[in-house]
A protein has these predicted regions:
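Extracellular or lumenal secretory-pathway regions
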Residues: 1-303, 310-518, 545-546
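Non-transmembrane, juxtamembrane loop and terminal tail segments
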Residues: 494-562, 572-575
Length: 576
């Protein structure tokens, strides 16, 4: 019986050990598989195939434009009246060229060929709609000249010369661009003012490149695309997608000394907890930021944690006093990174519709224009829904609003005589021009595969742990009971030469000497002493047979001897 108990105990301990060790083995195997899938260290990795060409997973782009409805009044000093129109939806496709790895395959360098395809079916209207707002062919060059005019007198002279061109001969054509939305956002070829400025090297080409880069040809790409680089996740997976080079710069922008520190948002060091502050390089804001957790979320059944841009990023002082001469609360000033063009980035619609306690866009900025916003529930926040086990972003939405100023323009002619244009306009009057939202999410199929593979293995891991631990504990409990009973028998009858009597039959408490029980002529009484007593002094040999009360079998007592008093003793008289 004690042997049975020991065996059960050993089996139980083995089950407990398996329940403790196997899940960690499964977890390690799962993480290794996920690591192999997400790393970018070779062209054979699954993640690289999507990274290098996202034709199966295009990024969504929604553009909302602020159409100026009172240009004549603005030229006479009136407050701009704007009507928000949209969305104009596009699919963004990226193909990586000039791909290379360092010798250790820890860093991946590339250039993206980016194009946008209009999605008319989901858009509010056609992107051939004519829109009007701030002129991106005029004001950027004016602000450069305004800042460094004495060093670049020729720039001012070329602007004056350009204002004599038929296409720019009126204040309206100088102050406003009136084009199709697609041309305004993505550019058009052969602008006469840019052609004039390009002759002196002030403009890169006669083509207006737009406010969002959309390469029109491979030649355009080769000439204008810049290099990016990121960590591949090898050998340290926690470095996966950490940006090391953005648009040829290792700093947040060319005119900054702050080194890039954060991922591109596609993944973060795993595991991700609610108390974490994942580091992001927000390229559109030229900022390193630490994201803030705001709540749990779910993407097609995959449980995620939602993180947003920190509220402190939008504050003027003291959090961002050193950041590019912040002007107003609620507006990120990226002027230094856009090469002297006054550029503010704000929350879309200045944060309209957000929690009032978090809406601190400076009223002085909002009051510089009147905007009729669309009444819809479209998401305007920038957020990342991060799967905490893998650190991968399952759903991303990134939004910002571009705000640029109108201004009075004064430039010299070839003789050095100054001329003022737009003299009645409100100087440095900031207006929102457009806002855009980029978004991407895992597909329903990918989410289902993730749930099946990752959650399936985790469920198996939990089931093995629970079953193994429960079975192990149960077997150990049974073993303890068996051992306790067995030890009780052993303790009660240790050192005795008799077996446990069968109380239901006195006859069964007798055995025969010299023969098997029931066959010899004289019985031997199994008394409760430490010996076998028999009547008479005859000897029947050295073997005494007794009946085992547990099995019913007749068993020999080896080395049985009889002393002068007629008592037998044996070395194996106790049976348990």
């Amino acid at each position: 019986m004690m042997g049975v108990g020991v065996t059960l105990c050993i089996i139980g301990l083995i089950c407990i050990a398996i329940s403790l060790l196997l899940p960690s083995t499964i977890d390690s195997a799962l993480m290794k598989a996920l690591q192999d899938v997400t790393m970018l260290d070779t062209k054979e990795s699954l993640a690289y195939s999507v990274f290098a060409n996202n034709s199966e997973y295009p990024i969504g782009l929604s553009v909302y434009f602020m159409n100026l409805t009172n240009p004549d009044e603005v030229l006479q000093g009136g407050i701009p009246e704007l009507q928000e129109i949209g969305p104009y939806n596009y699919k963004e496709y990226r193909v990586a060229y000039n791909v290379s790895w360092d010798d250790q395959h820890t860093t991946l360098s590339y250039r993206y060929y980016t194009t946008f395809q209009f999605d008319e079916e989901t858009s509010a209207s056609s992107d051939s709609d004519v829109v009007i707002n701030w002129n991106p062919n005029v004001f950027p060059f004016w602000f450069v000249y305004k800042q460094v005019g004495p060093l670049l007198p020729t720039l001012g002279q070329k602007l004056y010369e350009g204002f004599q061109l038929p296409e720019y001969s009126t204040d309206e054509s100088r102050a406003f661009m009136k084009r199709s939305l697609r041309e305004y956002i993505f550019g058009y070829p052969n602008d006469p003012l840019l052609a004039l400025l390009a002759q002196e090297g002030f403009a890169p080409s006669p083509d207006y490149s737009g406010v969002i880069r959309n390469f029109t040809s491979f030649e355009d790409f080769n000439k204008n695309a810049k290099q990016d680089a990121m960590r591949t996740g090898y050998p340290e997976i926690r470095d996966l997608r950490k940006v090391v080079l953005s648009q040829d710069s290792t700093t947040v922008c060319e005119d900054s000394d702050e080194m890039i520190d954060g991922t591109d948002g596609g993944a973060f060091p795993r595991p991700v907890k609610r108390t974490d502050r994942p580091k992001l390089f927000a390229a559109s804001f030229y900022r390193n930021v630490e994201l803030e957790y705001v709540g749990d979320s779910e993407v097609y059944g995959v449980k995620t944690l939602r993180f947003i841009l920190p509220e402190s990023m939008w504050r003027n002082s003291p959090e961002n006093q050193e950041k590019y001469s912040q002007i107003w609360n609620g507006a990120v000033n990226v002027t230094a990174c856009t090469k002297s063009i006054p550029t503010l980035l704000t929350r879309p619609r200045f944060g309209k519709g957000r929690n009032p306690s978090q809406d601190f866009t400076d009223p002085a900025l909002i009051a510089q224009s009147n905007v009729k916003w669309l009444d819809d529930n479209v998401a305007t926040d920038t957020y990342f829904d991060i799967e905490p086990i893998t650190g991968g972003s399952m759903n991303i939405s990134s939004s910002s609003q571009a705000v640029w100023p109108f201004d009075v323009i004064t430039v010299p002619d070839a003789n050095g005589v100054s001329h003022t244009f737009l003299q009645n306009i409100r100087p440095m009057n900031y207006v929102p021009v457009f806002w855009a939202r980029q978004f991407i999410s895992v597909s329903t199929k990918d989410a289902a595969d993730f749930r099946s593979n990752v959650y399936g293995m985790m469920d198996a891991e939990e089931a093995i742990f629970a079953a193994g631990l429960s079975l192990g504990i149960l077997l150990c409990v049974i073993a303890a009971v068996v051992l306790n009973i067995g030890y009780g028998f052993y303790y009660s009858y240790k050192n005795r030469t008799s077996v446990v009597p069968e109380f239901d039959s006195v006859a069964n408490n007798y055995a025969k000497v010299g023969e098997e029980a029931g066959t010899g002529p004289e019985p031997v009484h199994l008394d409760q002493s430490t010996s076998f007593a028999r009547h008479g002094g005859a000897t029947y040999g050295s073997t005494v047979y007794v009946k085992n009360p547990f099995t019913g079998e007749t068993m020999p007592l080896s080395n049985a001897t009889m002393d002068a008093a007629g008592s037998y003793s044996s070395s194996n008289a106790t049976y348990l």
